[in-house]
């Protein structure tokens, strides 16, 4: 093999090796990295659809880990008309829209003002809607069985 052919072969090897490295890096980006999001969601009766006159409020804070699709939050509420009868996470639904619940929170403290922590694992199909802020929580009471407090879950 002459000198020019060997040079060309070496250049080809370098290009091929670089291409393999580039593909490996690109693939690992899409299959191994996760994103961590902070989550918040103030809630009140005005966000319930249809709205109600509750003076109760709620604050949701936490994070979402896309590698294991886990939403981990603390929910504080105060001033409800009575203790919660249920707390749900609904979606997908934009602000001002309703949808069926996807998660039922358990071990809810039976107090008109309280705090609880929870984790919910989302499916891959649900994750896109969650990241698009299309999930909400609501707190139900005996006086407001369709929901006394609602808050959109917002990821940052």
Model-identified regions with their sequence ranges:
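Metal-centered catalytic cores of metalloenzymes
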Residues: 23-87, 91-156
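Bacterial Sec-dependent N-terminal signal peptides
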Residues: 1-36
């Amino acid at each position: 093999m002459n000198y020019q052919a060997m040079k060309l072969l070496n250049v080809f090897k370098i290009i091929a090796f670089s291409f393999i490295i580039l593909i490996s890096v690109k693939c690992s980006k899409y299959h191994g990295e996760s994103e961590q999001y902070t989550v918040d969601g103030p809630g009140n009766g005005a966000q319930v659809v249809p709205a109600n006159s509750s003076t109760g409020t709620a604050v949701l804070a936490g994070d979402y880990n896309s590698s294991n699709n886990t939403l981990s939050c603390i929910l504080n509420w105060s001033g409800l008309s009575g203790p919660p009868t249920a707390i749900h996470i609904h979606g997908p639904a934009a602000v001002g829209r309703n949808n069926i619940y996807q998660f039922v929170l358990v071990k809810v403290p039976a107090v008109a003002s309280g705090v609880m922590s929870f984790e919910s694992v989302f499916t891959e199909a649900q994750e896109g809607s969650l990241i698009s802020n299309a999930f909400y929580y609501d707190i139900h009471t005996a006086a407001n069985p369709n929901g006394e407090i609602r808050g959109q879950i917002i990821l940052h």
